[in-house]
UniProtKB/Swiss-Prot annotation:
Cellular compartments per GO CC: helical viral capsid
Record note on quaternary structure: Heterodimer composed of major capsid protein 1 and major capsid protein 2.
Keyword Disulfide bond in record: yes
Disulfide linkage: C96-C107
Principal cellular location given in the protein's record: virion
UniProt keyword terms in alphabetical order: Disulfide bond, DNA-binding, Virion
Protein's name according to its UniProt entry: Major capsid protein 2
Organism: Pyrobaculum filamentous virus 2
Record bears the keyword Disulfide bond: yes
Gene Ontology molecular function terms on file: DNA binding
Subcellular location: Virion
Role summary: Self-assembles to form a helical, filamentous nucleocapsid. Together with capsid protein 2, wraps arounds the DNA and maintains it in an A-form. Capsid proteins probably maintain the DNA in A-form by non-specific desolvation and specific coordination of the DNA phosphate groups by positively charged residues. This certainly protects the viral DNA under conditions such as the extreme desiccation of its host.
Length: 145
């Protein structure tokens, strides 16, 4: 936090405002650090899940990995978007189910383990029990020329 910001805080609200601004900044720093460690933890779990799927080749495996990465990205932001993360997780499970020798439970275990979430969260999204779901999207507009 810059000296100029402190000076403005003191002029506007006294030393208590400057102190509060400092505390808020420190809290944000701690939050960023905790997100950083969560991200590293999520990636290590993802690595374990990829090893579990490592014997399987082909496009569905690549899609599973891509969707798990997408879900991790949504979850690891400072303001996570769990709706989009769970949608990506559902797509990962559905792609995983296409792999030889995999069934829904094994896929749920792998994806939920990689994301560090309860597999019931993903299962609930798959069955449509995730808060009512939105209606279908409208038709796309024509190209603007």
């Amino acid at each position: 936090m810059s000296v100029e910001v402190y000076r403005q805080k003191i002029e506007k609200g006294g030393y208590s405002a400057a102190y509060e601004a400092t505390r808020r900044y420190e809290r944000e720093e701690i939050e960023v650090l905790s997100w950083s460690s969560r991200w590293e933890s999520a990636w290590s779990k993802f690595g374990e899940a990829v090893k579990a799927l490592g014997k399987i080749e082909g496009a569905p495996r690549a899609l599973v990995i891509a969707k798990v990465q997408e879900a991790l990205a949504y979850m690891s932001k400072p303001l996570p978007n769990m709706k989009l993360a769970m949608a990506a997780a559902v797509q990962a499970v559905r792609a995983c189910e296409q792999l030889p020798g995999m069934n829904r439970e094994r896929c749920l275990d792998a994806v939920a383990g990689a994301l560090g979430v309860a597999k019931d969260w993903i299962r609930r999204e798959m069955t449509g029990g995730g808060g009512g779901g939105g209606g279908g999207g409208g038709g796309g507009g024509g190209a603007v020329v």
